[in-house]
């Protein structure tokens, strides 16, 4: 157990029996009231966001974690098969552990898997940006290129991304895996 004042953003704690990652932690001292810490956390099992006020003297259970690099190999039903970059051992990761960014997983991409002290998978972090090829989108006309609108495009992983009008089939684009938004066209 450690004091809440020693916890920072990105720490993983056991809150109400389940692992939560601290997304933001703000110390507040309102007027003549006692100080407290306002925490925004994400439940790593359910993916839900939780807000909680910790008193300044409260202690929390900090989970000891280990981060390892893995390479995505293929999908097996609802599981994703990953290979350890050091030992070449393969593990199955549930879709829930990866979250909505799983739609941007493509063969050979490196991910960071966070393991808890008991060996269970807490979280899977994809790279912030990935480069994917546009497989299907409506063709752009000369008039469309002058406007700043967007159109839907299906990328090689099967995800749908909203892209500018000038993007065509075969274009390689950079996408933010956290939000699923188009960032830029990659010139090769």
UniProtKB/Swiss-Prot annotation:
InterPro entries: Elong-fact-P_C, NA-bd_OB-fold, Rib_uL2_dom2, Transl_elong_fac_P/YeiP, Transl_elong_KOW-like, Transl_elong_P/YeiP_cen, Transl_elong_P/YeiP_CS, Transl_elongation_fac_P
rRNA-binding listed as a keyword: no
A cellular-component GO term for this protein: cytoplasm
SUPFAM superfamilies: Nucleic acid-binding proteins, Translation proteins SH3-like domain
Protein name as annotated: Elongation factor P
CDD domains: S1_EF-P_repeat_1, S1_EF-P_repeat_2
Presence of keyword Cytoplasm: yes
